A protein has these predicted regions:
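A generic structural signal for well-ordered alpha-helical segments
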Residues: 13-14, 75, 103, 135
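Catalytic core of membrane glycerolipid acyltransferases/transacylases, capturing the structured
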Residues: 1-7, 15-16, 31-88
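Short, solvent-exposed loop/turn elements at beta->coil junctions and helix N-caps
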Residues: 26-28
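Short gly/ser/thr-rich secondary-structure transition/capping motifs
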Residues: 16-24, 92-94, 148-150
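Non-catalytic C-terminal accessory region of glycerolipid acyltransferases
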Residues: 30, 93-198
Length: 198
C-alpha cells in the first residue's frame, strides 16, 4: 500500500506539476543494520514518497491524524504508530517497547519528523526532544534526510509547477551519543543542507 501511494505521488508531482524529483546521497543509505530515519517536513510529499526511497518506513504520528478520512486509513494500512502528543496516557505506556519490537521483527525502518509538524521552507524551528528520546531508547543509527518539498507543495497556498524537489540523504549519525549532542548534530546537519538546497 505505501509503495503504491508513494509511486502515485511521484507520478503526479512529475507529470501534473512538471516537477523533477532528485535523490542525492544514496551512497549514505544504511545497509544491513537497524536504523531510523529523521527527515525534515515541509509538505505531504515526503509522507508518501519516502515509502519508495526506503523500505516502506513506519511513521510515528499524532493519534488524531488517524481520524482523517482516507488519509487516516492509509496511515493505519502502512502500520503507523500513533501517540497522544505531549501527554502520558495508558495508550502511550508501551510506546518505546512497541517501536523496539517493530524494529526487531521487521526490515522496515522507523521514520520521524523532528520538527513535529510541516513548516515553511525558510522556517527553522528547534527540533523536538522526542527525536532524541527515540534515539536514546532504540540505541540504533539515525539516517538524517533533508527535503525541500515546501517550494512545490507548501503547507499553505497553491502548489507550484516547474520546480525541483531534492531529497538529500545525509551521512548517518551513529548510536551512543548523549541526547543533547545528537539533537544538536541532527538539527545542524539537516538545516545546513536545507540552506544549501535553497
Amino acid at each position: 500500500g505505501g509503495r503504491i501511494m508513494g509511486n502515485w505521488t511521484g507520478f503526479c508531482v512529475k507529470y501534473f506539476l512538471s516537477t523533477k524529483i532528485i535523490i542525492k546521497g544514496t551512497e549514505n543509505i544504511i545497509k544491513n543494520k537497524k536504523f531510523f530515519i529523521a527527515a525534515s517536513h515541509q509538505s505531504m510529499f515526503e509522507t508518501f514518497y519516502l515509502q519508495t526511497v526506503f523500505n516502506s518506513p513506519v511513521f510515528i504520528l499524532k493519534k488524531e491524524l488517524l481520524l482523517i478520512p482516507i488519509f487516516g486509513w492509509y496511515l493505519k494500512k502502512i502500520g503507523s504508530i500513533s501517540i497522544k502528543r505531549d501527554k502520558t496516557t495508558k495508550d502511550n505506556l508501551s510506546f518505546y517497547s512497541d517501536i523496539s519490537k517493530l524494529i526487531s521483527n521487521s526490515n522496515r525502518p522507523l521514520i520521524i519528523f523532528p520538527q513535529a509538524t510541516r513548516v515553511l521552507p525558510n522556517e527553522r524551528p528547534k527540533f523536538k526532544k522526542g527525536a532524541s528520546k527515540i534515539y536514546d531508547n532504540l540505541k540504533i543509527i539515525c539516517q538524517p534526510v533533508a527535503i525541500n518539498s515546501g517550494y512545490v507543495w507548501p503547507k499553505k497556498g497553491k502548489k507550484n509547477i516547474n520546480k525541483t524537489i531534492t531529497i538529500s540523504i545525509l551521512k548517518p549519525i551513529e548510536a551512543g551519543l548523549q541526547n543533547d549532542e545528537f539533537l544538536k548534530i541532527l538539527e545542524k546537519n539537516i538545516y545546513t543542507e536545507l540552506d544549501f538546497l535553497n
